[in-house]
Design a protein with these regions (language model features):
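A structural signal for multi-pass alpha-helical bundles of membrane permease subunits
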Residues: 24-321
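Short, Lys/Arg-rich, polar N-terminal cytosolic tail immediately upstream
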Residues: 1-22
Length: 321
């Protein structure tokens, strides 16, 4: 019995110490309350609506009054004649965004870190962050101005240089859609996504760079032997999170660039799970069908998250948990 008394006292002392720290940091702790409330209201409470996917939901009878239909809506989604095309578009667009959008913030963060003048660095940081705060409605308007056949900037420049004789229909040609969509996404998100890598780079000790410089390493070599290895943990974590969103190909950007889904020519390469759910499920008031498609997407994303996290833990001992 006596052998356990010191452990109990130690545990009690730790609890008191932790409680004391919590009370001292109560103002800091309270700052997370709004975020927790938002997550609770918009992420966890709506999970109760998952049962709609297994019912033939009717607005008049409500969730509890609607009859159970099992996997009927999942079967309808998988057997839809557009399912293969939708999955292809979703995966291709997501992979293109991952291939070009994932390394771009890392490269930008490294380049910004190489700017010695702090004032110039902050200026370029601000310039690169700004696109993130521009609405997709505005971005779509900018793309129309740039790529329109009727007086579009790109067509005007190409024709003035003699590269083309007639204006190209960029906005209604399926061959250009993926390029335009991915380019716009990379431009819009790169600066903001670079923040986490800039923060990680700022935590690297300057002594490492000084020691490398004394050993004759150039600035370019220092990037590969110091900067990138030191932020590899952050790189892997961000990659895991990106892989877990493999079926989130986009919604508002695609919807705006396809004229609210009315451009049938583009929909053959633009229709993804989210736009399909909006068009077939929400607009047609097939709420159970839309929920089933959303549940399918969420399950696949969770599986990808678990797989990516497990592979990362085995290969590099870096994981989310």
């Amino acid at each position: 019995m006596n052998n356990h008394l010191p452990d109990k006292k130690a545990n009690g002392g730790k609890r008191k110490l932790n409680n004391g720290k919590f009370r001292q940091q109560i103002e800091l702790q309270s700052m997370i309350v709004p975020g927790l409330l938002l997550i609770m209201v918009f992420a966890y409470i709506p999970l109760c609506g998952i049962i709609v996917a297994f019912k033939d939901y009717n607005l008049y009878t409500g969730i509890l009054g609607s009859p159970w239909v099992g996997l009927k809506h999942f079967q309808a989604f998988f057997s839809d004649r557009n399912f293969v095309e939708i999955m292809r578009n979703t995966l291709v667009i997501s992979m293109l965004k991952l291939i070009f959008g994932f390394p771009a913030p890392i490269i930008l963060a490294v380049l910004l870190n190489e700017i010695a003048n702090i004032r110039n660095r902050r200026f370029f940081q601000t310039i690169t962050y700004m696109p993130h705060f521009i609405s997709w409605v505005v971005v779509a308007g900018m793309l129309v101005t740039l790529l329109s056949m009727d007086g579009g900037t790109v067509n005007s420049v190409l024709m003035s240089l003699g590269i083309i004789k007639e204006p190209l229909n960029f906005l209604s040609n399926p061959s250009y859609f993926w390029t335009i969509l991915v380019s716009a996404n990379v431009w819009k998100s790169t600066g903001f996504n670079a923040i986490i890598f800039m923060a990680a780079i700022s935590g690297i000790s300057p002594d490492l760079y000084e020691a490398a410089a004394l050993d004759g390493a150039s600035r370019f070599k220092q990037i590969f032997v110091i900067t990138l290895p030191c932020i590899m943990t952050q790189i892997v974590i961000v990659l895991i999170l990106n892989v877990s969103n493999i079926l989130n190909a986009g919604f508002d950007d695609i919807l705006l660039l396809t004229n609210n889904g009315e451009n049938r020519i583009l929909m053959s390469v633009a229709d993804v799970i989210d736009t399909y759910v909006y068009r077939v499920g929400i607009k047609a008031q097939r709420f159970s069908f839309a929920t089933a498609a959303g549940v399918f997407k969420s399950v696949i994303n969770i599986i990808m998250l678990l797989a990516a996290n497990g592979i990362s833990r085995k290969l590099g001992d870096v994981s989310l948990w």
